[in-house]
Swiss-Prot record:
GO terms for cellular component: cytosol. This is ATP-dependent RNA helicase RhlE. SUPFAM superfamilies: P-loop containing nucleoside triphosphate hydrolases (SSF52540). It is found in: Cytoplasm. Residues 219-381 form the Helicase C-terminal domain. Residues 373-454 are annotated as: Disordered. Belongs to the DEAD box helicase family. RhlE subfamily. Residues 424-434 have a biased composition (Basic and acidic residues). A motif (DEAD box) lies at residues 156-159. Residues 393-406 have a biased composition (Gly residues). In vitro, can replace RhlB in degradosome and facilitate the degradation of RNA by PNPase. It holds the Pfam family Helicase_C.
Length: 454
């Protein structure tokens, strides 16, 4: 199947071709025709499958096919909600790329930056608005944007929005929208909470599930190495050096842990940088660009800071510390093995993390293969201890960070960001992926009135 057969306009096809894409991915093959038919959609696809284009392309086709109901200033006709600033920036870049030859205006709004420039741009009229919920509600509260003409609503990474406690924000946004609209819900998994949200939001939706529920891509080779906690960094440096790994994304649980590990790896002679919410937008953007260009070999990240990162053909992901939430393991290793590429995911597991590993394997319904490098075997006399600061509080992309007015207070700055300038060379005939990488900016949270439960 080619993009030509999906009912997209020549101008959209031209833009897609200029990105070097020829063959739609499975999620695109199923989602694009359904959206063009006007169906509500409940789609589950892991990151890297091209899901962003799965809703962006038919959304643009819808807008150029139908004239807006309102006269005068362009109303917001398509609203895309995302949990983080970073993901919003990436989707916004996709929209701009694919609407290059269309008379379509788009805008990305999120917290962590001044609201005034966003208000000024909204005054000129916008067809497609990509937003984090908190900043969107700020703008609506200040009468900077009206949502009563929205024809298509997209909730992207809905599972993450629920995880981050943004359900009340979503409900408040829904009250601002017209009752008659098309709804598209995209999620990495079909959890029970997601299904409950879908029952209230969607009307007779088409369900698409490209990957099995809560499973890792078969293109990712997974391994576990048991090692004492105090020797993890030594083992990681050994494996990077011996294997001559040139591009490694490493996950830690905390921002402090990310900083400390990056410092230690640099002392080992391995060029590294940390990326998390306390880093300025400039620092995040530089680190990501340096990682993509090969100036640094290791990028150490927290879960939410790395959410939505798309680094082409990333060969190695390392869980320096296992996540407390098993589903986050799937999201982490989904950074590699994207589209048609293969990748390797390695987990360094100390005695404190054995239960976390069992939970992950229970979710995956299989045992992850073990490997052992001589000299790094764990000391059997060491007893397990409680994990300190184990469950990271979550943040996101609203006003200054999380976008959330919900019941959960995110940690400062674990949101997403603006788009990075660096972009790798495109290959001529690959499949259409999700998005391009982005950076992040942090600012102080402003006091705000509490939101009423919906």
């Amino acid at each position: 199947m080619s993009f030509d057969s999906l009912g997209l306009s020549p101008d959209i096809l031209r833009a897609v071709a200029e990105q070097g894409y020829r063959e739609p991915t499975p999620i695109q093959q199923q989602a694009i025709p359904a959206v063009l038919e006007g169906r509500d959609l409940m789609a589950s696809a892991q990151t890297g499958t091209g899901k962003t284009a799965g809703f962006t392309l038919p959304l643009l086709q819808h807008l150029i096919t139908r004239q807006p109901h309102a006269k005068g200033r362009r109303p917001v006709r398509a609203l895309i909600l995302t949990p983080t600033r970073e993901l919003a920036a990436q989707i916004g870049e996709n929209v701009r790329d694919y609407s290059k030859y269309l008379n379509i205006r788009s805008l990305v709004v999120f917290g962590g930056v001044s609201i005034n420039p966003q208000m000024m741009k909204l005054r000129g009229g916008v067809d497609v608005l990509v937003a984090t919920p908190g900043r969107l509600l700020d703008l609506e509260h200040q009468n900077a944007v009206k949502l009563d003409q929205v024809e298509i609503l997209v909730l992207d990474e809905a599972d993450r929005m629920l995880d981050m406690g943004f359900i009340h924000d979503i409900r408040r946004v829904l009250t601002k929208l017209p009752a008659k609209r098309q709804n598209l819900l995209f999620s990495a998994t079909f959890s029970d909470d997601i299904k409950a949200l879908a029952e209230k939001l969607l009307h007779n939706p088409l369900e698409i599930e490209v990957a099995r529920r809560n499973t890792a891509s078969d293109q990712v080779t997974q391994h576990v190495h048991f090692v004492d906690k105090k020797r993890k960094r030594e083992l990681l440096s050994h494996m990077i050096g011996k294997g001559n790994w040139q591009q490694v994304l490493v996950f830690t649980r905390t921002k402090h842990g990310a900083n400390h590990l990056a410092e230690q790896l640099n002392k080992d002679g391995i060029r590294s940088a940390a990326i998390h919410g306390n880093k300025s937008q400039g620092a995040r953007t530089r680190a990501l660009a340096d990682f993509k260009s090969g100036d640094i070999r290791v990028l150490v990240a927290t879960d939410i800071a790395a959410r939505g990162l798309d680094i082409e053909e990333l060969p190695h992901v390392v869980n320096y510390e296992l996540p407390n939430v098993p589903e986050d393991y799937v999201h982490r290793i989904g950074r590699t093995g994207r589209a048609a590429a293969t990748g390797e995911a390695l987990s360094l597991v100390c005695v404190d993390e054995h239960k976390l590993l069992r939970d992950i394997e229970k979710l995956l319904k299989k045992e992850i293969p073990r490997i052992a490098i001589p000299g790094y075997e764990p000391d059997p006399s060491i007893k397990a201890e409680p994990i300190q600061n184990g469950r990271q509080q979550r943040g996101g992309g609203g006003r200054g960070q999380g976008g959330g007015r919900g019941q959960q207070q995110p940690r400062r700055g674990e949101g997403g960001a603006k788009s990075a300038s660096a972009k790798p060379a495109e290959k001529p005939s690959r499949r259409l992926g999700d998005a391009k990488p982005a950076g992040e900016q942090q600012r102080r949270r402003r006091p705000r009135k509490p939101a009423a439960a919906q």
